[in-house]
Amino acid sequence: MSCTPCRPQKRLTRPRSQVPRVQTLATEVKKGGVEVLAAVPLSEETEFKVELFVKPVIGNTTAAQDGREPTPHYWSISSAIHDKESGSSIKVEETPDADTTVCYSLAEIAPPDIPNQVSECDMKVWELYRMETELLVVPLVNALGNTNGVVHGLAGTQLYFWAVGGQPLDVVGVTPTDKYKGPTTYTINPPGDPRTLHVYNSNTPKAKVTSERYSVESWAPDPSRNDNCRYFGRVVGGAATPPVVSYGNNSTIPLLDENGIGILCLQGRLYITCADMLGTANSRIHTPMARFFRLHFRQRRVKNPFTMNVLYKQVFNRPTETVDAQVGVTEVTMVEEIGPLPPSIQTTLPTSVNLTQLPRTVTLQSQAPLLNTQQNSK
């Protein structure tokens, strides 16, 4: 007898649960108010590098003359700070001299023009994607002199700050104490009562660093703004804390955010703000001689925020000259052939099916300067 082969039994498998498919949405990244697209490949024409030294700024006590504001002092050592004594206690300096106050240094860079920058769909802008910065400092030993045979060095409060952005740095106005008012000349002080400005509140004034008259003791970077900006700062306190400054040309700072986008120069400008303090010696504030920047740019495409209609109205349809013209002039509108009348004169003329019987000339009175003095309707 021949035996029949056994059929293999089918395994009972459980139905595999279907993994739900996650719906992927198009990622739209906005920065500086525009939609950011891809970066332009690097080449000699799409990359740009600039180096600059930014000098420290000390306020000026000179009053304004002939309506012109005093220029800042580009010093590395301030004037002597004088304490006001009342009996045995030292009062807080409420209105210090401007030449004892460190202000934010400001620099502006205009990258070169990009050929064929704007198209109907997108436009190319410069993007700052990495940088190097360091302080220009030297050790101070003999330069500080000695007292009673003891050589003194720098010590005290220190500040290290820099910022780069496509717009000027946004700052908030605060005061260190409820009595501090700031210098009476040169510097721009926060408006308001110092008793309410020494802590942040809804009435805290906000501003942009558009000049070198903003004191570091009265204005601080605004963390709620500065979207298209990168800044870094460090404050070291202590009456006898010596400065520790490291410098070298082997460190690079990337400026890309979590989406891989750097600082966009949407207005064709890059604004650099910095302020540094090494400490005090002999009642004077010492700063570095300068802060060095090496900036690396590349080109980035962004979605064109302007339609052709907007460009036509803002660029081409704008009068080249501003004149003070008459407003009570008479406009003559010619109505030719048979066609609908302008809405502005339909209510003043009798309606009729046969428009050829209507007047061919209509006179209107205008109360504003006229742009189009003659209108032809077919």
UniProtKB/Swiss-Prot annotation:
Region (Disordered): 1-21
A biological process from GO: virion attachment to host cell
Coiled-coil region: none
GO molecular function terms listed in the Swiss-Prot or TrEMBL record: structural molecule activity
GO CC term (a single one): T=7 icosahedral viral capsid
Localization: Virion; Host nucleus
First and last residue of the signal peptide: none
Keywords assigned: Capsid protein, Disulfide bond, Host nucleus, Host-virus interaction, Late protein, T=7 icosahedral capsid protein, Viral attachment to host cell, Viral penetration into host cytoplasm, Virion, Virus endocytosis by host, Virus entry into host cell
Family the UniProt entry places it in: Belongs to the polyomaviruses coat protein VP1 family.
Quaternary structure note: Homomultimer. The virus capsid is composed of 72 icosahedral units, each one composed of five disulfide-linked copies of VP1. Interacts with minor capsid proteins VP2 and VP3.
Biological function: Forms an icosahedral capsid with a T=7 symmetry and a 40 nm diameter. The capsid is composed of 72 pentamers linked to each other by disulfide bonds and associated with VP2 or VP3 proteins. Interacts with sialic acids on the cell surface to provide virion attachment to target cell. Once attached, the virion is internalized by endocytosis and traffics to the endoplasmic reticulum. Inside the endoplasmic reticulum, the protein folding machinery isomerizes VP1 interpentamer disulfide bonds, thereby triggering initial uncoating.
Designated name of the protein: Major capsid protein VP1
Organism whose genome encodes this protein: KI polyomavirus (isolate Stockholm 60)
